[in-house]
Design a protein with these regions (language model features):
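Short, solvent-exposed loop/turn segments at secondary-structure boundaries
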Residues: 39-43
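Short glycine/proline-enriched loop/turn "hinge" motifs that connect secondary-structure elements
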Residues: 18-22
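Short beta-strand segments enriched in small/hydrophobic residues
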Residues: 23-38
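Catalytic-center loop of serine/cysteine hydrolases
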Residues: 4-17, 38, 48-167
């Protein structure tokens, strides 16, 4: 999956074409699961999903699919292999949110669809009063996990961090 560029040169009346590929990892961030939450809490979970998509989409070294794709995949209950085949997704990010009073827990996992395994699972506890701060932090944390811990090509991973910090 990627973009293709063709360079042509005229060498002794022969055209020589060189295929160069550039490939960006493709991410799909599934809507945060909200079973058992109030309508207001479901709105917060949707906001977390949208914020992660927005934050990661601004980073040019990866391609993040739209929220409409995420919500469609959830609504149609697409399986991981169908998501990979239909959209070329490399990494799938899923999560769930639990709320008790003013305290919340967000569980996230990153699945490498090529390897067909969960490569990272983490939880984040926070106070609902800090929901916007949490939304802002999550995209950066996911980016760091993808580039450093998952080593999406170790050289590529460190390039991602450098490019991200220079934005």
């Amino acid at each position: 999956v990627g973009m293709f560029y063709f360079n042509t040169s005229n060498d002794s009346d022969k055209q020589v074409a060189t295929l160069q590929t550039t490939s960006k990892p493709i991410l799909l961030i599934m809507p945060i699961k909200t079973s058992g939450l109030t309508d207001d809490q479901k709105g917060f979970a949707r906001g977390i999903t949208e914020s992660m998509i927005s934050t990661l989409s601004s980073y040019q070294a990866i391609k993040v699919l739209s929220s409409s794709t995420s919500f469609h995949a959830q609504k149609t209950e697409m399986l991981d292999n169908a998501i990979r085949e239909n959209y070329g997704v490399d990494y799938l990010i899923r999560g769930s949110m639990q709320v008790m009073g003013n305290n919340a827990r967000l569980n996230l996992e990153i699945t490498d669809l090529k390897a067909a395994k969960v490569t990272l699972s983490k939880k984040k506890d926070f106070n609902m009063e800090n929901i916007f701060k949490v939304q802002d932090e999550l995209g950066n944390e996911i980016l760091n996990e993808l580039s450093i811990n998952l080593g999406v090509g170790s050289a590529q991973g460190s390039d991602w961090v450098k490019q991200w910090k220079s934005m």
